[in-house]
Amino acid sequence: MGSFWDAFAVYDKKKHADPSVYGGNHNNTGDSKTQVMFSKEYRQPRTHQQENLQSMRRSSIGSQDSSDVEDVKEGRLPAEVEIPKNVDISNMSQGEFLRLYESLRRGEPDNKVNR
């Protein structure tokens, strides 16, 4: 005859917690840390050496038009300009913020939800 606690026994004990793997996230066995990527935010990885973030960040003093002129002088069109991944929006001008915002929405469908 079994005890009262036998009613709460787990049928397949290997399906649940195993004492040999306590203490960490063991679902992501292929990498050392969890990586989250959403499809609409995906960008191709850079092939050239990453520049210094300070050199990538545009000055908040300059206007949008002057920065576009500098890019054209360097031979880059405004659509081809690299956009930094981590930026401090508190130091950006309104034009710089709008350019960054629009570049992140590139490729999304134009429907009422996204307007």
Curated annotation (Swiss-Prot):
The superkingdom listed in its UniProt entry is: Eukaryota
Write out the ranges of the annotated region (Disordered).
Answer: 16-77
* Stored InterPro entries: Spg4
Composition bias, Polar residues: 25-37, 50-66
Q: Outline what the protein does.
A: Stationary phase-essential protein not required for growth on nonfermentable carbon sources.
Its UniProt miscellaneous note says: Present with 259 molecules/cell in log phase SD medium.
Q: Which family does it belong to?
A: Belongs to the SPG4 family.
This protein's name: Stationary phase protein 4
Species assigned in the record: Saccharomyces cerevisiae (strain ATCC 204508 / S288c) (Baker's yeast)
Q: Which gene encodes it?
A: SPG4
